[in-house]
Regions:
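Noncatalytic modules at the cell exterior or secretory-pathway interfaces
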Residues: 410-422, 468-477
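Catalytic-core regions of glycoside hydrolase
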Residues: 1-151, 157, 176-185, 191, ...
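Beta-strand acidic-aromatic groove motif in beta-rich domains, primarily in extracellular
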Residues: 430-431, 485-493
């Protein structure tokens, strides 16, 4: 029996209800999979299941983690936990009938270092020194572990590999205009670590596995810088500087195409490879067409209601799908005309037949350094409109009404008390109505109240029911109306 529900739905499953479900089954006839110990520890922040359920009524059980949802390529995961978390279960008085150690990712071909660590840890009943393990891993994978490489690992363990993110995605992997911040832990150490990894290429340029990882790490670096650019572009549109916004858009396009090009050299992180698998499985032309459409859909829109779930960082997908969708969005920002991104996505999935191959006859190390130099100056220091827990921006013409949609990080739901809209441009009155919060496709908060702004701010109170986790996404929708004058501002969650 898969045990996701035991951590995810504690408001339903307690010790007694689990007993009602499993106690009559002979112990040797049942195997429980404690599916997501990492979620218990680092996302739900709840007591681990073997303690909470007191050894699962002595049923056989497997210690398991889910390092990945949907095959996302973004980096995340507390390496020390994946190396040593199982030791807590082995030492527990409630270990019960623990029989195995495993992992259950929804997708692989991502976060290779994490999978190597988890599978190695399964053979150990002793504490693993993760830094020493990383040194040995680097020696085995690249043939050497120079100082710059170890410095890179140190920094990454203070960012993406020292934190756990549910559904790690850059904001440009989600529909434009619906999300302000991605969910990847892009602190200063993230960029320092990736810069150090790229610098290690001077000593590791002859290692084929290092060059493969260099492609991916460079893409992660550029992906973070591209996210910052989307925020800067949005800021300039909000402040009315369309010339600067267009200049930044050209930089954004350069970085996206840079990611796309360098990953074309990677053996697995490519859309053409994925589509080739699908088409080769077909026996007829009709099947081939349908399989290709299905393959496109699952790595892009996926849903609804779960959209952009797979979030692959792949050559062909970045330059053609993600960049294409943002260019369509910016076309609407420049012209002031509405764009139908859902229709654009449908056409890309069902009608697109573009080629996704670059000429790969180029020097990987030189190109990685070139792209680093082009993007290193982009930083959060250039963001003037940052607010705590900010989730997006809004702008309206005089007397206009418009519906807005914002992705809300699931981690905010537990303490979320409401939202605040702050006007930064214009002095017109703002009205908010039709507020709705949808978690996992279900409306959990809905209000028909019409609220007006006071002194440039508008506050909407929200009561999020207990037990709402929104593992597959949380979206806030609302309708705003400008009573008089052009207005623009930001929206933030109140915690």
């Amino acid at each position: 029996m898969q045990g996701w529900m035991f951590g995810y739905q504690r408001h339903i499953w307690d010790y007694e209800t689990l007993g009602a479900l499993v106690s009559r089954v002979p112990n040797e006839k049942m195997l429980l999979l404690d599916l997501a110990v990492d979620y218990n520890k680092h996302f739900w922040h709840s007591e681990v299941n073997w303690e909470y359920y007191k050894g699962f009524y002595n049923k056989q059980w497997v210690y398991s983690v889910i390092p990945n949802m949907g095959g996302k390529v973004g980096m995340t995961g507390v390496l020390d936990f994946y190396a040593n978390g199982h030791l807590e279960a082995l030492a527990s008085a409630n270990r019960g009938n623990l029989v195995a150690h495993g992992l259950a990712p929804e997708g692989i071909e991502n976060n290779e270092v994490l999978y190597e660590l988890v599978t190695d840890a399964g053979w150990s009943n002793r504490h693993i020194d993760v830094r020493e393990w990383l040194r040995q891993y680097s020696m085995n994978r690249y043939g050497a572990a120079p100082e710059q490489l170890m410095t890179a690992w140190d920094y990454l363990m203070k960012s993406v590999y020292g934190s756990f993110t549910d559904h790690p995605r850059f904001n440009w992997q989600l529909r434009p205009g619906s999300v302000k911040n991605g969910s990847i832990n892009m602190n200063a150490d993230y960029f320092r670590g990736l810069e150090s990894f790229i610098a290690a290429s001077d000593k590791l340029k002859d290692s084929p596995y290092f060059l493969t990882d260099l492609c991916e790490m460079t893409a992660h670096y550029l992906g973070g810088k591209a996210e910052l650019l989307t925020k800067l572009i949005d800021q300039e549109y909000l402040l009315g500087d369309t010339l600067k916004a267009r200049f930044l858009q050209s930089r954004f396009e350069t970085l996206m195409l840079g990611m796309d090009r360098i990953l074309s050299w990677h053996p697995t992180l490519r859309l053409d490879r994925w589509l080739s698998f699908a088409k080769k499985s077909a026996r007829t032309d009709a099947q081939r067409k349908q399989y290709e459409i299905n393959a496109r859909r699952i790595v892009t829109v996926w849903g609804p209601p779960v959209d952009d779930y797979a979030a692959r960082i792949w050559s062909g997908l970045i330059g053609n799908y993600y960049l294409g969708r943002w260019k369509e969005y910016y076309r609407g920002r420049e012209s002031g005309e509405p764009v139908n991104l859902a229709e654009w996505e449908r056409r890309w999935v069902e009608e697109n037949h573009d080629s996704y191959r670059w000429n790969t006859d180029f020097d990987i190390v030189s190109f990685a350094k070139e792209m680093l130099a082009l993007s290193k100056d982009i930083s959060t220091a250039q963001l003037l409109l940052n607010r705590p827990n900010m989730v997006g921006t809004w702008s309206l013409g005089s007397g206009k009404a418009k519906e807005f949609e914002y992705h809300i990080p699931a981690r905010m739901l537990t303490n979320m008390k409401g939202i605040t809209l702050e006007g930064l441009k214009g002095n017109g009155m703002l009205e908010c109505s039709g507020l709705m919060l949808v978690a996992d496709g279900i409306a959990v908060v809905s209000s028909s109240e019409v609220i007006s702004s006071k002194n440039g701010k508008l506050y909407c109170k929200m009561i999020v029911p207990n037990g709402v986790n929104a593992n597959n996404g949380c979206v806030l929708t609302l309708k705003l109306k400008s009573k008089d004058g052009n207005v623009a501002g930001v929206i933030a969650c109140d915690m």
